[in-house]
Amino acid sequence: PNLGLVLSYSVPRVATPGVGGTAPETVNSPTQGNGLFNGSNTLFSQLTLKPSDNLKLGLAYARTYNSTGTGVSGNNGTNFANNPFSSAAGAGNRPTTADHYSLLASTNLSPNLILSGWGGYTQARRQDAAGKADIWEYALTLAAKDFGGKGNTLGFVAGMQPKLTSNSGDTAARVDAVSGLNFEAFYKYKVSDNLSITPGL
């Protein structure tokens, strides 16, 4: 489990900036490799813009430090994307920092049809030796609100899971040769004001 704090402030119809951070439960441990500044942590900021009633834009940045060098992509995507500098001999012993950049956009094609997309880029760096890795991901979603009844939503998602595209140092060979593509369809059915179910495939 992680502990976290998020602060945000909204300027109606214009922008919503926010900042926050998370750290594992070991943040309160005084032992080596733990604590707020010596253990794994995440600091992030985000800015949501609404240039018009039909368009929303989002910018996000996160700075992470992982003391073991694993889970760089939040345990999503390929093994290389999550463990860019790990190997059979050194897994779990390669502390890594990473800068994560994201761009999001959403527009109303009609009152009930929403098209959204986002892309992300991560640059990870080893802290115990030379090594830098580039990781990319993206997704596109289409959602139809009130489809089949008020409060229901039919949605489709297509995208690429986090993929390690380049690497350097003694793990330069750890690069994904193929992309992990993801396709989903779901239907959120509103049973009542307090209950909904979402089957998907």
Model-identified regions with their sequence ranges:
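Residues on the lipid-exposed face of transmembrane beta-strands in outer-membrane beta-barrel proteins
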Residues: 1, 45-49, 103-107, 140-144, ...
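Aromatic- and glycine-enriched pocket-lining scaffold segments that form the walls
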Residues: 1-48, 181
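Repeated loop/turn-to-beta-strand initiation elements of outer-membrane beta-barrel proteins
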Residues: 2-7, 43, 53-59, 66-68, ...
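Transmembrane beta-barrel strands of outer-membrane/channel proteins
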Residues: 7-11, 59-63, 117-121, 140, ...
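Gram-negative outer-membrane beta-barrel proteins
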Residues: 13-17, 65-71, 84, 123-129, ...
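Hydrophobic, lipid-facing positions within transmembrane beta-strands of outer-membrane proteins
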Residues: 41-45, 99-103, 136-140, 154, ...
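C-terminal hydrophobic structural anchor segments
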Residues: 141-195
